[in-house]
Amino acid sequence: MYLKRKVDDFLKKWKQDPDRKPLIVKGSRQIGKTESIKHFAMEHYESIIEINFVRDEKYKGIISDGYEAANIIKNISLLDPSKKFLPGKTLIFFDEITEFPEIATSLKFFCMDRRFDVI
């Protein structure tokens, strides 16, 4: 059973904004941020690319070729070819970025790229 949270409405408004930028969701631990984002993603995207930097440390190497969106997408695809990047239909969800703060630098490149939504 899913419990509706205040962030749910915010995520929907963010998705409707044609000029949306990558989103960083902050909050206390264990309040349901990840669950809310996953629920939102299942309702609004055809493809969800979830990268959890605690559970999947291998993804910390995705910036090895730089912070440009194309390089990061290529490196994620090399690590897991089953991940589908569909322009305009994919949410890339970087979870637990406090464990890999360097990935935040890539957000401006994803903003310029605009093919994928990023949280």
Language model features with spans:
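Phosphate-binding site recognition
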Residues: 1-119
